[in-house]
Every structure is written in C-alpha cells, then in structure tokens.
Swiss-Prot record:
Organism whose genome encodes this protein: Mycobacterium tuberculosis (strain ATCC 25618 / H37Rv)
Phosphoserine sites (modified residues): S61
NCBIfam families on file: ant_ant_sig
PTM info: Putative phosphorylation on Ser-61 may prevent interaction with RsbW.
Keywords, alphabetical: Phosphoprotein, Transcription, Transcription regulation
Biological process annotations from GO: regulation of DNA-templated transcription
GO MF term list: anti-sigma factor antagonist activity
Protein name per the record: Anti-sigma-F factor antagonist RsfB
Residues of the signal peptide: none
Function: Positive regulator of sigma-F (SigF) activity. Binds to anti-sigma-F factor RsbW (UsfX) preventing its binding to SigF, thus activating transcription.
C-alpha cells in the first residue's frame, strides 16, 4: 500500500481479526492514507478490527476524528479496538473521551483477546 513517507500502514490477519499497524505521524498530510487503509479493510467485512497505534509518533486531531468515524461507521457489526500506549496516543484519546466510544488496549495481545471476547488479565 502506497503511503506518504511519514506514515507506515501494515495490514495483517490474526486468526480472523484484521489488524492495522500504524507507524509514524497521523496528521493532515497522512490522514488520507490512513482512511484509505481502513476503508479497504472494512470493505472486506472483518468480524473484528484492531488499529495498533504503538508505533505512532504523533496523533493529530484528524487522527482522533478518523478513529471516532471508524467506530461510528462499523457500529456494532464489527468488534473494534485500538492499541494505544504512552502520552502520544493514549492521552489524547482519553482527553477527548474516545475511550468511551471504542475499546482501548495497552498491547496488541490484549486487543486481540478483547475483541475476541476473551478475558484480559490485569
């Protein structure tokens, strides 16, 4: 998938769960690449979608908007979770209250377990 230099998007299937791993910066310049990647994955009608922001270095307001729009678009038809840790990603998601809109996880392992309906040990 072609993307601007300041973002990387990797799509993988983890036993039926679509995982988008994002790296770099999510801003006005890279937003279209992220929206395109999410659109392609959602078009395949996955049962669950995890967006992994572990390698994101900057999460602008447009990225928060994309996450909220994705959650709204897929509704209850697709289980949805976001991996965010650290102040770059987790803090803005929490401050905007988006952690009440979609499930937020600290690790990919927890996200995969969570969207599959499993128990997450803390």
């Amino acid at each position: 998938m072609s993307a601007p230099d300041s973002i990387t998007v990797t799509v993988a299937d983890h036993n039926g769960v679509a995982v988008l791993s994002i790296g770099g910066e999510i801003d006005l310049i890279t937003a279209a690449a992220l929206e395109e990647a999410i659109g392609e994955v959602v078009a395949d009608n996955p049962t669950a979608l995890v967006i992994d922001l572990s390698a994101v270095e900057f999460l602008g307001s447009v990225g928060l908007k994309i996450l909220a729009a994705t959650s709204e678009k897929i509704g209850q038809s697709v289980k949805f979770g976001v991996v965010a840790r650290g102040s770059v990603t987790r803090r803005p998601i929490h401050l905007m209250g988006l952690d009440k809109t979609f499930r937020l996880f600290s690790t990919l392992h927890d996200a995969l377990t969570g969207v599959r309906g499993g128990r997450i040990d803390r």
